[in-house]
């Protein structure tokens, strides 16, 4: 069989390949035979005809519906051109009924459509969903989610979680505390626990306390709730919370992310705790345990109330005097949290590496021959920009290796575990870490959930890359402007 590959929607640049993947010349016009990109077929040399055509499945296509001109009718609806986001697909005709508003303005639409048939010049499509107007920022982001294959339903998980949460009472909390071996840290006189986050934050997944020479870092134990409520099998395929200028698309239903799992003030919550013992300005011991905590305050970064808090001041002074802070200069509360999260990720990675399990973070600088001595003398803001600009590859892997990043160079291993409310990898590492450290052995459903995602590590990396692209504001602005230019009157 032969394969047809096209690079533009006008079919001006296309190629044919044989079954050995060798490029060949065939005397056929792909438009005459209505071939889509990546179609396979047999070629009859004598009759100059193609047979056994195997077209790719085209059942959910994002595109822009152009409403300034009609092209006939199909089943009592006018046909309009629809330009697919995928530039390898030709322009379709899609039936649509225009509804004029008060101002009589016809605005092009972001849509999802499917392929029906291709009998004439343009293939015919069928509308699946009208996402919204091209000059609407929310519609644009929904359109991008569809194209980047990041639109996953959490309806089943949301409904089930809501039913479970409604039944939570004091007995439930005590049952979880006992079952998951959680030490009681809810006495604020002994453990003044607080969070530091942006002002609009609701999904608090990390907290901290300090008591003399011991710093405790607490991470929301999302795995405990999912395990207790038996939610593993209905988890969605979302790999991360997505932060957009106009909204947040949570990895978990908000009843979990912003409420039950979130380390909210004055609420009993479950967290895995890392204890750092400080002596002579060095970390001399690190230990982990499951805890039940009650946060005393949800602070905002650098607010006056935080700066005046004696516990925060003690924490800040202790960290600024530490001898090793992974090249992080601790100047404010942002640096405090950054250092503590890096520290926990690092020490957890050492344990996971020793036990030969876990999902590790691998980040490489594009220029491996970069002269670090010269870079080190640059002003901090320029150095940050330079290294962030050069940093182009970041993946998750099952193999621990050198971790090269903006603030902490060449750690022998590194994992993400401190944001389990927001990232699937952190949740997966949280499961394995507790198992490997004999903190708690989760259910078979939890282990199956972990194994399923380990086998889909490529998908995690691809989706995370797509999410990073989607969150780049510069790209949003230019794309939205180009689509808004298509507004018709």
Each model region followed by its residue ranges:
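Append "with occasional cross-activation on large, charged helical scaffolds in nucleic-acid assemblies
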Residues: 288-291, 301-478, 489
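Short acidic-glycine loop/turn motifs at beta-strand connectors
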Residues: 47, 211-212, 277-283, 355
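Secondary-structure transition/capping motifs at alpha-helix termini
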Residues: 225, 234-235, 279-282, 347-355, ...
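Short beta-strand elements
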Residues: 83-87, 206-210, 275-278, 288-290, ...
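An acidic- and aromatic-residue-enriched active-site/binding cleft used to recognize and process polar
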Residues: 219-223, 231, 247, 279, ...
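Conserved catalytic alpha/beta cores of large enzymes that bind or transform nucleotide phosphates
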Residues: 241-328
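Charge-lined substrate channels and their catalytic hotspots, especially those that engage the 3′ end
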Residues: 1-219, 223-267
């Amino acid at each position: 069989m032969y394969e047809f590959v096209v690079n533009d929607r006008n079919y001006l640049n296309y190629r044919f390949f044989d079954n050995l993947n060798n490029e060949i010349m065939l005397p056929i016009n792909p438009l005459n035979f209505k071939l889509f990109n990546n179609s396979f077929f047999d070629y009859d040399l004598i009759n100059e005809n193609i047979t056994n055509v195997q077209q790719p499945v085209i059942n959910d296509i994002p595109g822009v519906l152009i409403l300034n001109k009609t092209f006939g009718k199909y089943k009592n609806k006018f046909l309009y051109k629809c330009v697919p986001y995928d530039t390898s697909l030709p322009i379709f005709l899609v039936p649509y009924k225009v509804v004029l508003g008060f101002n009589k303005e016809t605005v092009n639409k972001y849509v999802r459509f499917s392929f029906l048939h291709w009998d004439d010049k343009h293939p015919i499509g069928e509308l699946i969903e009208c996402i919204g107007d091209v000059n609407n920022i929310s519609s644009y982001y929904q359109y991008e989610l569809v194209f980047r294959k990041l639109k996953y339903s959490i309806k089943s998980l949301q409904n089930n979680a809501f039913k479970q949460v409604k039944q939570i009472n004091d007995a439930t909390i005590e049952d979880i505390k006992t079952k998951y071996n959680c030490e009681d840290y809810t006495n604020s006189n002994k453990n003044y626990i607080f969070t530091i986050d942006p002002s609009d934050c609701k999904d608090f997944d990390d907290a901290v306390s300090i008591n003399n020479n011991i710093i405790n870092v607490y991470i929301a134990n999302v795995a405990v709730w999912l395990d207790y409520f038996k939610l593993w099998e209905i988890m969605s395929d979302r790999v991360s919370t997505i932060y957009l200028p106009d909204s947040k698309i949570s990895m978990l239903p908000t009843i979990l992310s912003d409420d039950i799992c979130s380390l909210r003030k004055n609420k009993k919550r479950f967290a895995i705790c890392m204890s750092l013992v400080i002596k002579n300005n060095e970390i001399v011991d690190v230990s982990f345990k499951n805890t039940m905590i009650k946060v005393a305050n949800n602070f905002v970064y650098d607010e006056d109330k935080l700066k005046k808090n004696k516990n925060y001041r003690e924490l800040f002074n202790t960290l600024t005097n530490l001898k090793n802070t992974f090249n992080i200069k601790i100047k404010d509360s942002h640096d405090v949290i950054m250092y503590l999260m890096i520290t926990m990720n690092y020490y957890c990675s050492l344990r996971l590496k020793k036990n030969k399990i876990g999902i590790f973070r691998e980040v490489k600088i594009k220029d491996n021959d970069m002269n670090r001595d010269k870079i080190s003398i640059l002003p901090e803001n320029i150095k940050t920009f330079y290294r962030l600009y050069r940093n182009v590859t970041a993946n998750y892997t099952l193999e621990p290796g050198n971790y090269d990043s903006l603030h902490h160079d060449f750690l022998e291993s590194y994992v993400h575990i401190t944001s389990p409310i927001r990232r699937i990898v952190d949740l997966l590492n949280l499961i394995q870490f507790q198992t490997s450290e004999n903190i708690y052995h989760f259910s078979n459903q939890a282990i199956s959930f972990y194994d399923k995602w380990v086998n889909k590590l490529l998908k995690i990396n691809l989706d995370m890359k797509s999410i990073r692209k989607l969150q780049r504001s510069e790209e949003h602005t230019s794309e939205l402007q180009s689509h808004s230019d298509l507004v018709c009157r």
